[in-house]
Amino acid sequence: MLPAHKLTLETLLAETVKQVATASQGASEAAFVSPAITLERPKVAAHGDVACNVAMQLAKPLRANPRQLAQQIVDALLAQPQAKGLVEAAEVAGPGFINLRLAAAAKQAVIAAVFAEKEAFGRSQRDAGKHVLIEFVSANPTGPLHVGHGRQAALGDALSNVLASQGYDVHREFYYNDAGVQIQTLALSTQARARGLAPGDAGWPASAYNGEYIAEIARDYLNGVTVAASDGEPVTGARDVEDLEAIRRFAVAYLRREQDMDLQAFGVKFDQYYLESSLYKEGRVEKTVEALIAAGKTYEQEGALWLRTTDDGDDKDRVMRKTDGTYTYFVPDVAYHVAKWERGFTKVINVQGSDHHGTIARVRAGLQGLGVGIPKGYPDYILHKMVTVMRNGEEVKISKRAGSYVTVRDLIEWSGGATPGSEAAVDLIDEETIRRGRDAVRFFLISRKADTEFVFDIDLALKQNDENPVHYVQYAHARICSVIAECKARYSTDESTLADVDVSPLTSERAMALLNKLAEFPDMLQHAADELAPHAVAFYLRDLAGEFHSFYNDRTERVLVDDAAERNARVALLAATRQVLANGLATIGVSAPVKM
């Protein structure tokens, strides 16, 4: 149902309920407070287009039979002049549900709405003026992005688009963990390669990174290559194998650039890259620790500094500063979230792997301990589960380049049709292969709820049939483009006039089902924003594509017919469907091909 129709119906029902309730009680309408009117889609299509349970809500306080009360509301509603043209029929079902069937004209109105709003259809300004920071990916600059980072990128970027569709001012942020033990390991690994060592050689560091990318970094360092991340200063290889700090700076810059390239291939952009090292340089970590000590939220035991996280629901207190004077990994996270708060972001969402579950209570406890007014549930978290990559029925665990895991770039290239293991598949992939791969990976990785494990089947991603969900949706868009092009060629159909077409011939069951699905798009986006559920967009697109294919494959709904009225109405329906498919695909960062 279109938002305008929903608002009208909610208002009508509220007025009708007030009339019926006050008449039965003999009270004044001014004294009656109507409960919130909730409209839902019935689970069974045969039960109508809209269901409402207001009669059951009021039955007890009004001491009335819910079915009888529902019937009174139905009779009064249908008598309202404003209901004409909006509600075709209403009936009482079950214990007192009110089931409404919308008039055909109300359903057909979605076509005019889509033509009027075009790319803006489905969007609203409901949350205009609100600001949200979404942190996602946030990988250590110690290697290429893996498939888990890919799932974060798909989820975080789609969620950003969903919230922006409702008027939010969205700030996308990538937090670089460029301090700590892993960065030291990266430097030592690169130094070992620069000295000519390889994994397995005597003298190779025990905890070193073994991927081929380390050899590439060492080679470019020794050759004096200059590299820079998108927001960083250029760093030139110093060629000195003994200068570990120079190696560290070069390796971090090199991998930040590589991760930028991975994200570019994935079509993801960030508003800001925030460096963990900056927290130490600016004294934010020390300041946060000192504030917690001053607030009495810490204590010393066995040479370590502990945070009283049990005060805020954690199962045990946690070490903040170890006996060697270094901080545990959640301490800079607390300082980082203070920085988010101080920048004015009162709503923050972190998209992270489920392995971060244990840090949630610690970070929130630290923020509460500071006593600076940060709400208890700050920040929000979306935790995703692992991704397993399958090909030819077997799990793929190793990437030649990364050494121990499948990278995002691997997944994009393989899903686009590049051959795993081929040298050409690293740097010489054409744009069309990247587009196909990016579309498949992005759609697949948000096609399940974040808290479910996901099996990414490369073979399925390569299929050009209805089994492949992204192909199924994109083909619906391309198919409509083809039909409209044929209409132009055969009947000189002018797309610019479709907004004025009489769509009253669209009365069949298939047409009504497709119209209903189009009208659900705005509500679906609002629900996805409220529930932080970008997967809802993928679910919707599959359903919409299904309704279109069912309509188009029905021989009684042929579009290319001689009857101009029937043909133009159906072309208008297809054009509206094409627009909504394109809008939905754009929301999740997937292209809408004209040809396939």
UniProtKB/Swiss-Prot annotation:
<dbReference type="GO" id="GO:0005737">
    <property type="term" value="C:cytoplasm"/>
</dbReference>
<keyword id="KW-0963">Cytoplasm</keyword>
<dbReference type="InterPro" id="IPR005148">
    <property type="entry name" value="Arg-tRNA-synth_N"/>
</dbReference>
<protein>
    <recommendedName>
        <fullName>Arginine--tRNA ligase</fullName>
        <ecNumber>6.1.1.19</ecNumber>
    </recommendedName>
</protein>
<comment type="similarity">
    <text>Belongs to the class-I aminoacyl-tRNA synthetase family.</text>
</comment>
<keyword id="KW-0030">Aminoacyl-tRNA synthetase</keyword>
<dbReference type="GO" id="GO:0004814">
    <property type="term" value="F:arginine-tRNA ligase activity"/>
</dbReference>
<keyword id="KW-0547">Nucleotide-binding</keyword>
<dbReference type="InterPro" id="IPR001278">
    <property type="entry name" value="Arg-tRNA-ligase"/>
</dbReference>
<dbReference type="InterPro" id="IPR035684">
    <property type="entry name" value="ArgRS_core"/>
</dbReference>
<dbReference type="GO" id="GO:0005524">
    <property type="term" value="F:ATP binding"/>
</dbReference>
<dbReference type="InterPro" id="IPR014729">
    <property type="entry name" value="Rossmann-like_a/b/a_fold"/>
</dbReference>
<dbReference type="Pfam" id="PF03485">
    <property type="entry name" value="Arg_tRNA_synt_N"/>
</dbReference>
<dbReference type="InterPro" id="IPR036695">
    <property type="entry name" value="Arg-tRNA-synth_N_sf"/>
</dbReference>
<comment type="subunit">
    <text>Monomer.</text>
</comment>
<keyword id="KW-0648">Protein biosynthesis</keyword>
<dbReference type="InterPro" id="IPR008909">
    <property type="entry name" value="DALR_anticod-bd"/>
</dbReference>
<feature type="short sequence motif" description="'HIGH' region">
    <location>
        <begin position="139"/>
        <end position="149"/>
    </location>
</feature>
<dbReference type="InterPro" id="IPR001412">
    <property type="entry name" value="aa-tRNA-synth_I_CS"/>
</dbReference>
<dbReference type="InterPro" id="IPR009080">
    <property type="entry name" value="tRNAsynth_Ia_anticodon-bd"/>
</dbReference>
<dbReference type="Pfam" id="PF00750">
    <property type="entry name" value="tRNA-synt_1d"/>
</dbReference>
<dbReference type="GO" id="GO:0006420">
    <property type="term" value="P:arginyl-tRNA aminoacylation"/>
</dbReference>
<keyword id="KW-0067">ATP-binding</keyword>
<keyword id="KW-0436">Ligase</keyword>
<dbReference type="Pfam" id="PF05746">
    <property type="entry name" value="DALR_1"/>
</dbReference>
